[in-house]
Amino acid sequence: MDITIYLSLLFLGVYLAGLAVRRWIFLRDKRLMKSEIRSGGRAVAKIDELEPGCVKKFWLICQKYRIDAFLVNDQGQFHAYVNRCRHMATPLDFIRDQFLSEDGRYLMCYTHGALYEFANGMCVEGPCKGEALYRLPVRVDGDEVLVGCPEGDLKALAD
């Protein structure tokens, strides 16, 4: 067999295998999501799991799009935001799972240094000053924190 044909078939096989794996992961994740969804959103944390000033990453499937997000405990009040800096739409945690400024008082974009307030997601310092993170609806149900999907066109917020 000619080496060109062999390599073409090999690359085609690898490509198709990659598609199959991605499809399987998406369907598996979608099944997991369905089991965790209830009226009002997806349970993303237990109340006692997240201490004040702590942040937890999670994701949602909203209108067929995967939305990467995070939950922050602001002195017992929970807030959830899409994990996208308003400056360049990069994840805030460029350094894995690092969302807080050094003093722990602000959410921080580690790509551009933008600082955001916990309570309203407003950028108070940096290139996006005056803009707010995309907020997600949050409610507490018993001992769980539920986060719902935002309204509107979500294509720009998805990965």
Where are these regions (language model features)?
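Feature marks short, highly hydrophobic, charge-poor N-terminal signal-anchor/signal peptide-like helices
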Residues: 1-10
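N-terminal pre-ligand scaffold of iron-sulfur
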Residues: 6, 15-101, 117-118, 132-159
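Short cysteine/histidine-rich metal-coordination sites, predominantly Zn2+-binding motifs
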Residues: 99-109, 123-133
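Short cysteine clusters
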Residues: 85, 109-112
